[in-house]
Amino acid sequence: MKKPTKLRLEHLVKLDPLTDNQQLAFNSFASGNHLCLDGSAGTGKTFISLYLALESVFKKEYDKVIIVRSAVPTRDMGFLPGTQEEKEDAYTAPYKAIVNDLFDDYGGWTKLIEDRKIEFLTTSFIRGITLKKSIVIIDESQNCNYHELCSVITRLGEDCRFIMAGDYYQSDFTRKGDQDGISQFIKIIKNMREFDHIEFKWEDIVRSSFVRDFIMTKEMLERGKID
């Protein structure tokens, strides 16, 4: 079947929650709250975030989705070789795959970029921007330091939604100050009425049973629960 040249809401593959916490994320988003999705890999945090955000954009509730990431480990894409687009490819690949799956269209990501319904930024390039009528997703947020997280959230202008997705056991930071900064930011948003913090557990891992077993064993070792 020929794929559409312009994507619409009816082209978005219907996604149903697979676990109680996924359902909680759906319900919380529908209530109008900002989200902090925290937990293990394979629980669908990024997939859900993009689905909910794109559905809202195609319902014309917002103009576009903006995906934000910290450029770890360089923290500045200027250190990477190639053009700006080539530099971004290293970071956008997971989102391209998800978007293409959500629309069952290999060219889905490109079509949304061309239609200005989705945009990718790093924290290095967000300063000085005021974001309006957008859903902002900070993915891999465990790799943003306190200053970066504050910089992003204070960019939000009128009619914006904010979604954080990360696994705070798996930060790339080695400095205690950076780790403490993430904890401080989480404390702030937990005390905001407009935020819902949803913690995904091992039972929420839906990628595969093998991945679930691996992550459970890995995290139990890291936490000293097994030898």
Regions found by a protein language model. Name each.
Residues 2-138, 142-227:
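Conserved helicase motor core of SF1/SF2 NTP-dependent helicases
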